[in-house]
Amino acid sequence: MTSHTFFCVDGHTCGNPVRMVAGGAPALQGANMVEKRAHFLREYDWIRTGLMFEPRGHDMMSGAILYPPTRPDCDIAFLFIETSGCLPMCGHGTIGTVTMALERGLVTPREPGVLRIDTPAGLVEARYEMDGPYVNSVRITNVPSFLYATGLEAEVEGLGLVKADVAYGGNFYAIVSPQQAFAGLERVQPSDLLRWSPRLRQAFGRKYQFVHPENPAINGLSHVLWTGAPRHPEAHARNAVFYGDKAIDRSPCGTGTSARMAQWAAQGKLDVGSDFVHESIIGTLFRGRVEARAKVGELDAIVPSIEGWARMTGYNTIFIDDRDPLKHGFQLKDNV
C-alpha cells in the first residue's frame, strides 16, 4: 500500500479558495505546459480529484501546482486544478498562488516586482506590491481575451429561451445579461444560479461549439457569468460566475473579468487605458484595465490586466492513502 503526500499552502483570493501545491506532485512529460497539462490529465487526474473534491476539498475548491517553467522567459509554471478540471488559466488562482509563493519564499523573480508565469494558456505576467514580507496586491496581465460570439440562444429548462454572448478570458464564458428569462443578479438567489447554470451550460454546449482560434486544445464552454447592477460605489458591474458542478466564485473571477472586459471593449464601452472595476457576489472587487488591443486568429482581442489581493490561511499536509476507498475524492450530486 502507498500513501501519497502533498505539501500545500491554503489561502483565498478576495474570498475564493486557493490551494497551492508546493511539493509532492509528479514530474510531467511535455515540451510546454499544454503538453504537460495533457499528461497530467491522462495519468494523474486522481491527484486533482483527491485534493479538490471532498473529503479533502469541497465544491468551491481550486488551486495550482508549482512547476519549473518550460519557457526561458518565465520564472515559474502553474498548473491549475479545480473541481471542474485543469483550467488553461485561472485569474483568482494566479493572484493567490503568486501571493503565497512569494510570501513563503518559493520563487525568486528575476526582476523584483514582476513574476512571469508559464501557464497552459500562455505567458502571464504578474506585478506585485510588497509591504515588508507581505504581498499587498497582485496585478496580472492576462492572455489576449476576445468576444467569441454574440446573441446566441438556447432553451434552458426552468428559464425558457436564454440569450448570451460568449467571450474568452482564459476560459470560455457564457455571459448572461438581464433579459426576460433572467431579471438580473439582484433579483435571484444563489440557489437559483446553482440550479440554472448546469442546464444553461449543457444547452449551449450541445447547440454550439467553442474552440480557441489558435489553440484547439482549449475548447468547450466551462463557465457561466451572470450579470447585474453594481452595489459597491466604485464598481462598474457585478457578477456571479458558476464553474464546476456546484460552485459560484466568491471572488469577481479573473478570467471572467477578462472575458467581460473583452465583451465591453467589443461593444465600444472600453478602450486602451480604460479601467473596469468588477464586483463579486460577496462584494469584493477586482480592478481591471485594458492594456492593449490584439488579434487572436481573425478575432479582435484585448490584453487585459486584473488587480486583486489574497491572504494565506494555513499550511496543509495532505495524504492520499491507497487504502482509503475515497482516496480519489467524491462529489455529492443530485443523481446519487
Sequence positions of predicted segments:
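A glycine-rich beta-to-alpha transition motif near the start of alpha/beta enzyme domains, typified by
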Residues: M1-D165, A174-V336
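Glycine-rich ThDP/TPP pyrophosphate-binding loop and its adjacent helix/strand module
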Residues: G170
